[in-house]
């Protein structure tokens, strides 16, 4: 049987189809769990603000204490779990006993270490609060320590949850870990609901340091910890179904953690450096709350770390749903290209990820920026002044939110090459920036500190992209920059149009007047969001089509594939008919292209050449797709020359399409672009000509790249 027939049989076999359907259902189930968990997380945050108030010293104190368990776990043990334990669990799961003996010993060791760590940290709660806060008075310090004692036991359950999640994932059970956080949020929401029912909302009954009691602490901090406990306990149900026979086992010599720790040492250092810098920034973020607690009644509102926390959750949401998911899928493609030493394939995967994710990330940034006012009012517990504080902070963060996803996608390239050292250098530079910036920020007026920290995050996002791009150029030669800029410019045009449309809608709701309808109450703010957001999205998608942003199709294809399945008589993809003047591609090329269309990460779409601002900056180009000239005659095997012989009137530069003027000379913009993006080995070379043969048959490229 020929290779082409084998490929067709593999693609169309019932087993393959059933496997793809099963994977699709599992992926949809996990995505649904993640989305529901995110939604409930924002419901929990909204209830917390409704119960305690956004500009409340109690809220700032609780947010700081409730963040400590997660920060301590990530600082001390999070890097160990990700860099050391996960590879060992995956390796052990392939053993004849499915890793039962090894995992039992590992879980016994992890439980003992995490329990000891949690006990020590909880006993040292007063010292930890002093180290992570600044300017707290006696009453606020006492409440902070109380909150910490209730919240710090979460460290143990975070560690156990992380370990159980990896054991389940290693055995193919992915959904439980995605759905368990939903129960966590429901428990916390239940506690906050009881709080509002018993003690009233902050709007009608302000809760202060003076009138706070033990029952209130239990309903807020106690239920927060209870949610984490229930979340972890639920994972024992699917774990029991695996029938691994796990039990306490001692004796850890020869387990192999030492060798794994050496491999993951750079990843561990990256985690430690980033978390230490973050802890210091959070310490500075507590200053405004301390100043507000000691300020006389009637003082102007000051944004505290609760404002920064809510704004950070909102700005991180698009990245966590879109970019993380896409990067997870693309990482396999990057890893294969790295293993094959395929620089071109690695560059194509990165370019595909940066362009495809940007379709959603650019809109998300524009939406957060334009809708910052109603979002702030919705989370303000009915206080317009507090809503304005959140709106300003969110606007600052939204400006550079795409850079967060860009840098994350870039670092996947390093990890695919098993290079954890370069991300450490990037994180080290960011840590230095955060430490120096936070040290300077503490001397600003209290009302400006949170805004300055948000600005510091934005500067860090930009710096991380620049540093990562610098190191990536040494690996990839160039980053497919013109094509990426081409797509980003088009998306930017669509984003501007969407922003103007949303601005008009918000103007109708009175967003730009202090007495406007939007600022009357939270219901008015929510109504304006529900009207403006769909209008902005519709305008954005329409303009993406107008500007021929092909990446929209690549982003939507895997999403629509979950709901739209071809009938038995339909083909998954249909190759367009070739013009009569162009030879038809061989059948194996059509089959290969059809197979690539089924994989959302495999396609490298053609990019239209007209951006308006930067005409003909780049064309869609990869080793399998070349643009043929309109008139050419074959000269030899697979090569061609312009009719009439001689040189082409429009020279070809390097291996990208280049903007040229009508007389064939390159513009200053093109010269600058080539100097900025192209490495010395790929600078324009006069006299080279574009390959004029059929797609995928360029003899100047190795067969494995065609």
Regions found by a protein language model. Give the residues of each.
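Long, low-complexity, intrinsically disordered segments
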Residues: 610-706
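Membrane-embedded alpha-helical bundles of multi-pass transporters/translocases
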Residues: 1-593, 597-598, 602, 612-617, ...
């Amino acid at each position: 049987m020929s290779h082409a027939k084998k490929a067709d049989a593999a693609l169309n076999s019932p087993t393959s189809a059933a496997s793809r359907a099963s994977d699709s259902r599992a992926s949809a189930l996990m995505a649904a769990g993640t989305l529901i968990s995110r939604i409930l997380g924002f419901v929990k945050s909204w209830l917390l603000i409704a119960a305690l108030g956004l500009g409340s010293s109690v809220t700032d104190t609780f947010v700081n204490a409730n963040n400590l368990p997660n920060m301590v776990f990530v600082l001390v043990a999070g890097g160990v779990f990700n860099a050391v334990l996960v590879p060992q669990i995956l390796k052990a799961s392939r053993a004849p006993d499915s890793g039962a003996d090894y995992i039992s010993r590992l879980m016994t060791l992890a439980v003992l270490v995490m329990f000891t760590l949690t006990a020590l940290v909880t006993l040292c709660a007063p010292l930890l609060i002093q180290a992570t806060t600044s300017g707290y008075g006696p009453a606020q310090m006492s409440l902070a320590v109380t909150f910490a004692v209730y919240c710090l036991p979460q460290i143990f359950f975070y560690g156990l949850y992380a370990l159980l999640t990896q054991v389940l994932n290693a055995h193919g059970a992915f959904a439980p870990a995605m759905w368990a956080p939903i129960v966590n949020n429901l428990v916390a929401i239940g506690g906050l609901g009881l709080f509002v029912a018993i003690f009233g909302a902050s709007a009608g009954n302000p809760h202060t340091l003076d009138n706070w009691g033990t029952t209130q602490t239990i309903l807020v901090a106690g239920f927060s910890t209870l949610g984490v406990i229930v979340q972890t306990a639920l994972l024992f149900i699917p774990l029991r179904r695996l029938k691994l026979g796990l039990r306490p086992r001692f004796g850890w010599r020869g387990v192999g953690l030492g060798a794994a720790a050496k491999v993951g040492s750079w990843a561990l250092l990256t985690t430690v450096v980033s978390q230490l810098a973050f802890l210091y920034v959070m310490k500075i973020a507590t200053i405004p709350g301390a100043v507000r607690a000691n300020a006389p009644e009637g003082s102007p509102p000051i944004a505290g770390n609760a404002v920064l926390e809510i704004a950070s959750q909102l700005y991180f949401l698009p990245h966590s749903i879109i970019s993380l998911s896409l990067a997870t899928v693309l990482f396999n493609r990057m890893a294969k290209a790295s293993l094959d030493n395929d620089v071109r394939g690695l560059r194509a995967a990165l370019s595909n990820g940066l362009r495809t994710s940007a379709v959603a990330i650019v809109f998300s940034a524009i939406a957060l920026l334009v809708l910052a006012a109603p979002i702030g009012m919705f989370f303000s517990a009915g206080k317009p002044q507090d809503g304005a504080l959140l709106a300003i902070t969110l606007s600052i963060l939204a400006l550079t939110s795409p850079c967060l996803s860009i840098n994350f996608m870039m670092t996947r390239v390093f990890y695919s090459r098993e290079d954890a050292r370069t991300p450490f250098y990037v994180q080290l530079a960011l840590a230095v920036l955060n430490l120096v910036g936070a040290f300077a920020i503490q001397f600003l007026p209290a009302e400006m500190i949170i805004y300055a920290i948000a600005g510091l995050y934005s500067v860090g996002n930009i710096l991380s992209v620049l540093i990562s791009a610098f190191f990536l150029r040494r690996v990839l030669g160039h980053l497919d920059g013109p094509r990426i800029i081409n797509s980003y410019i088009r998306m930017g045009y669509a984003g501007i149009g969407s922003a103007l449309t949303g601005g008009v809608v918000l103007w109708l709701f009175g967003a730009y007047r202090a007495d406007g309808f939007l600022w009357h109450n939270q219901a008015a703010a929510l109504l304006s969001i529900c009207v403006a957001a769909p209008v902005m999205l519709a305008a954005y998608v329409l303009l993406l089509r107008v500007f021929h942003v092909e990446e929209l199709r690549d982003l939507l294809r895997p999403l629509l594939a979950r709901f739209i399945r071809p009938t038995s008589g339909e083909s998954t993809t249909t190759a367009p008919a070739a013009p009569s003047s162009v030879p038809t591609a061989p059948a194996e090329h059509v089959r290969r292209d059809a197979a690539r269309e089924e994989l959302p990460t495999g396609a490298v779409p053609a990019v239209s050449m007209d951006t308006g601002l930067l005409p003909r900056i780049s064309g869609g180009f990869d080793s399998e797709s070349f643009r043929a000239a309109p008139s050419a005659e074959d000269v030899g095997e697979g090569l061609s020359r312009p009719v009439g012989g001689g040189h082409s009137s429009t020279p070809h530069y390097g291996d990208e399409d280049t903007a040229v003027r009508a007389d064939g000379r390159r513009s200053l913009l093109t010269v600058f672009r080539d100097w900025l993006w192209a490495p010395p080995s790929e600078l324009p070379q006069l006299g080279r000509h574009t390959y004029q043969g059929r797609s995928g048959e360029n003899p100047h490229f190795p067969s494995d790249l065609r």
